[in-house]
Structure formats: structure tokens, C-alpha cells
């Protein structure tokens, strides 16, 4: 089984947001970077069977940007357990629920993702906002796995820029984004 841990894109800083943390959106730069990332992931042949996202706005938006590029429209699901308290117990439950899938992409948050990757692989990783890690899990019940690759957000954007122009996100998709500072 292949697991992709995609951390949500760059979001509006808490200090600049008057609403609750759950509704904090991506910045305009975060939306743009995730569009580049989605294009790069498609070019790399990333084709998960299932895309599962946290219910928090910034993760939802990230998943909405990535899904069409990876051919996952209609296969996006939201799981409350992918919120900030996501851990091994919740991961095992998701793996059981999607036992027929060969690969799963999870869109969520740190420190949960880096903690789980460490528990699975034994390695310490840093996962930037908009970064992704691919982990190979040999057996679904195993707590042992291999980190196949890790791409930070700037690497995904760089790969997109070096190949050709990735598609931009439609103007309507960026209207909800807040200022690009942070």
C-alpha cells in the first residue's frame, strides 16, 4: 500500500485571521503553490485510488485543488479524524475502511503527519506546508514502512516551473484566499 501524506498549502496566519482556526483559508500564494504542486504530482504519475481530507478549510481547499489534476474528482472524502489530533489509531481505522485501495492520499496537518511518518519509518522528517511524503507500507497491519520520497512545497513548484507552465487556478478559486503574506 502506498500512502501519500500531503500537508495543506500555506494558510492565512492565525494572527491575521479573526475567525475560528477551522475556517482559516489558504493564502493566494498557497492556492497558487498548490496548483503548481497538483500539476507536478500529476506529471510524476501520482494516482492514488482514494483522496481523504481533513475537515478544516485549508485542507479541504488543498484537496479541491489537487483532486482534478490527479483524476480524483468524485473520489474526495472528508474524515473528521484527519483533524489536528490525527494519530496511528485513526490511520489504522482509515486503512481498514479503505482496505481495497492500493494507494491513499491524506490531506492534513502537522505535527500529526510528521509524527506518523516517524512512527511508521523510524525517520525524522520535516514536511513544509504544501509538501508531500510518499510512504510504502508493506503490510496493512504493520507499523513498519519505508519513506519512498519527500518533496517540499518549493520543490514541487520548482519542478512545475522547470518543465513548462502549469495550469493556473481559475479566478473564482482564488477569491476566498486572503493576503499572500506570511
Q: What label would you give each PLM region?
A:
Residues 2-80, 85-86, 123-127, 163, ...:
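Active-site-proximal alpha-helix that buttresses catalytic centers in soluble enzyme cores
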Residues 62-66, 91, 116-117:
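Hydrophobic packing residues within well-ordered alpha-helices of enzyme cores
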Residues 83-97:
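Short phosphate-binding loop-to-helix
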Residues 97-133:
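Non-DNA-binding regulatory cores of transcription-related proteins
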Residues 121-146, 152-156:
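Domain-level recognition of soluble alpha/beta enzyme cores
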Residues 144-182:
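Charged phosphate-binding loop/patch that engages nucleotide di/tri-phosphates or the phosphate backbone
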Amino acid at each position: 500500500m502506498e500512502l501519500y501524506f500531503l500537508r495543506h498549502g500555506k494558510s492565512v496566519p492565525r494572527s491575521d485571521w479573526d475567525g475560528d482556526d477551522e475556517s482559516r483559508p489558504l493564502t493566494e500564494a498557497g492556492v497558487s503553490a498548490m496548483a503548481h504542486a497538483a500539476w507536478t504530482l500529476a506529471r510524476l504519475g501520482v494516482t492514488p485510488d482514494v483522496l481523504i481530507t481533513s475537515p478544516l478549510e485549508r485542507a479541504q481547499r488543498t484537496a479541491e485543488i489537487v483532486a482534478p489534476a490527479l483524476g480524483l474528482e468524485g473520489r474526495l472524502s472528508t474524515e473528521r479524524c484527519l483533524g489536528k489530533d490525527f494519530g496511528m489509531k485513526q490511520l489504522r481505522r482509515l486503512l481498514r475502511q479503505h482496505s481495497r485501495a492500493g494507494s491513499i492520499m491524506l490531506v492534513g496537518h502537522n505535527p500529526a503527519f510528521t509524527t506518523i511518518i516517524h512512527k511508521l519509518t523510524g525517520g525524522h522528517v520535516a514536511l513544509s506546508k504544501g509538501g508531500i511524503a510518499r510512504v510504502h507500507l508493506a503490510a496493512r497491519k504493520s507499523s513498519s514502512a519505508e519513506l519512498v520520497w519527500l518533496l517540499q512545497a518549493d520543490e514541487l513548484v520548482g519542478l512545475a516551473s522547470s518543465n513548462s507552465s502549469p495550469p493556473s487556478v481559475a479566478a473564482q478559486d482564488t477569491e476566498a484566499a486572503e493576503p499572500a503574506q506570511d
